[in-house]
């Protein structure tokens, strides 16, 4: 486990953004007559930014291999 304060900050911020995205997705699911597209799009962008920060803490080759093994994703795409 990482005890680094920077890792903790990145992990916390990513978690917050993922929860916000989940909240908007649930709202859209529960209220299909309303349009949450813009809010969902914004939250996806926020999650993407924070996820890219977290990726720096981990073995990207191992993650790429996981994607190939689990989903058959072409390594050139990763």
Language model features with spans:
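Flexible "arm" and connector segments at domain edges
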Residues: 1-78
């Amino acid at each position: 486990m990482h005890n680094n304060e920077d890792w903790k900050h990145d992990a916390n911020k990513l978690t917050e953004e993922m929860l916000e995205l989940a909240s908007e997705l649930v709202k859209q699911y529960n209220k299909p007559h309303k349009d949450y597209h813009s809010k969902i799009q914004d939250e996806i962008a926020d999650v993407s930014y924070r996820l890219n920060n977290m990726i720096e803490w981990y073995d990207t080759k191992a993650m790429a291999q996981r994607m190939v093994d689990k989903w058959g994703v072409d390594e050139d795409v990763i």
